[in-house]
Amino acid sequence: MKKGLLFIASILISLFLLSAVAPKQGNDPWIVPEKYEKMKNPFEANKESISIGKSLYSQHCKSCHGKEGLGDGPKAAQLDTPSGDFTTKEFQAQSDGAIFYKTREGRDDMPSFKKKIADEEDVWHVVNYVKTLED
């Protein structure tokens, strides 16, 4: 009986320790539906759009993604998953529709902005702004 309890306890401890070092979900590829991958931004990336996007970014995104979009905002260190760096070639290579989808839907520590930025037009302006943050 003691051996059985000892065995079960060691299994539970092992599972607990493994879960502590397992990779976080944010390392998984973020799958964007094809509909959004192909979606075109209906707003030209002009001064007005970028200015609106920058204002919204400062209000809703800067605390995690940082002033320059490097993923180094004051809240980034508290997150379980890395905050995205918008200046990378990988990020900038994404379609506008993919960025729109990720902003609206969120995942893991990245919240959905469907309610905070309810107007889809405003999300497109944020997309135009973050596309200016390339390295």
For the regions a protein language model found, what residue spans apply to each?
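Positively charged n-region of N-terminal signal peptides that target proteins for export
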Residues: 1-4
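Bacterial N-terminal signal peptides
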Residues: 9-16
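Bacterial Sec-dependent signal peptides at the C-terminal "C-region" and cleavage site
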Residues: 18-28
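Electrostatic cytochrome c docking/interface patches
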Residues: 26-56
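Sequence/structural segment immediately N-terminal to covalent heme-attachment motifs in c-type
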Residues: 47-70, 76, 104-105
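Solvent-exposed, polar/charged alpha-helical surfaces in well-ordered, non-transmembrane soluble domains
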Residues: 51-59, 84, 97, 101, ...
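Electron-transfer interface patches adjacent to heme c in soluble/periplasmic c-type cytochromes
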Residues: 82-97, 113-123
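C-terminal capping alpha-helices of c-type cytochrome domains
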Residues: 102-108, 114-135
